[in-house]
């Protein structure tokens, strides 16, 4: 079973090779990577110059500059050939056992996810986990998923692929996972940290304006869940998602207040109690 991996690339010249090297190090070698340029840059030439060009790599472009990771991922869907799909940001990496660990569960349940290890890009040091690490396999329903304070990057079967919602950039991964869980019922979550999530102070999600942008996004999503189309969710899922976004919005507002007193405070430190 081939797993396709979509990698949006925006100003990724200094980090894409690390992401690709982590795929080449997988203990399961049956994968395809779709690199989606979202900045007009020729990443194929970059990879070729680095001596890493191979048949498992496909290069496409959004034809735009900074259209957003949600749009880039949707463009990448048109190039996948695998029976399963997962995501990898160009500035992140997978540990070698990720496919080996998640693929059997995805075959059985439709999808599976692992925990993220958050890493400071500047120092290379792991950051405190935002949640306590469980010791066994969990099956998250939507209410349990909405209690998490860190992203999840699932691997799922092609039959469960859905396009990302256009125009939803902030917390767009949360929306995608809500729709996935609504579709499959529960999401298996292994206790291993197999996805290394590098945090840059300059990234959109960690900029000084992020709290305001997240607050507005959460308000918009809640309104859509309460009296809009509900993103196509069933009634129970709409209620769980609405309650979850209300919690996330309150947490984001508390973090913004804490940052006013302590500007250097990171979200990871805030939610982990450090």
Which residues are covered by each model-predicted region?
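A conserved acidic beta->alpha catalytic loop
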Residues: 29, 35-47, 89
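Glycine-rich, basic loop-to-helix element that forms the pyrophosphate-binding segment
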Residues: 63-80
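Catalytic core of nucleotide-sugar-dependent glycosyltransferases
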Residues: 193, 197-200, 206-236, 259-263, ...
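Short aromatic/hydrophobic "clamp" motif used to bind/position activated sugar donors
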Residues: 85
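N-proximal low-complexity "stem/linker" segments adjacent to membrane-targeting elements
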Residues: 1-22
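Short, acidic, metal-binding catalytic loop of nucleotide-sugar glycosyltransferases
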Residues: 21-30
